[in-house]
């Protein structure tokens, strides 16, 4: 006969494993970066519009286009991760084959910012 057990939430399981808030948010953001935004996202509920804005085909030589992409990216991240209070997104390198981004996020109740250098390489964000 099996003894009843109390189910453990995934968040509690992660906390037991010693994974801190920065690592949790970093993992969540990497999942977001490697998903695509749905077409017509403005007319869909927020849960269905998550995903990265597409950057292929953009004129990366135009600073206005890169600024637009950073704003879209920032909006997608803030919709996806409520623990981020302040977020700065900038293009680190757009003039070579892989697109490189820099993100700096201030998390709720965390004194140190989360800093990420993310590069698009071989079809994935790393």
Swiss-Prot record:
Keyword Cell division: no
Molecular-function GO terms, alphabetical: anti-sigma factor antagonist activity
Top-rank taxon: Bacteria
GO terms for biological process, alphabetical: cellular response to oxidative stress; DNA damage response
Record has Protease as a keyword: no
Location, primary (coarse class): cytoplasm
Subcellular localization, as worded in the UniProt entry: Cytoplasm
Pfam families per UniProt: GPW_gp25
Keyword annotations of the record: Cytoplasm, Stress response
InterPro entries: Anti-adapt_IraD, IraD/Gp25-like
Membrane-crossing segments per the record: none
Gene Ontology CC terms, in alphabetical order: cytoplasm
Task of the protein: Inhibits RpoS proteolysis by regulating RssB activity, thereby increasing the stability of the sigma stress factor RpoS during oxidative stress. Its effect on RpoS stability is due to its interaction with RssB, which probably blocks the interaction of RssB with RpoS, and the consequent delivery of the RssB-RpoS complex to the ClpXP protein degradation pathway.
Family classification: Belongs to the GpW/Gp25 family. IraD subfamily.
Quaternary context: Interacts with RssB.
Name the UniProt record assigns to this protein: Anti-adapter protein IraD
Source species: Salmonella arizonae (strain ATCC BAA-731 / CDC346-86 / RSK2980)
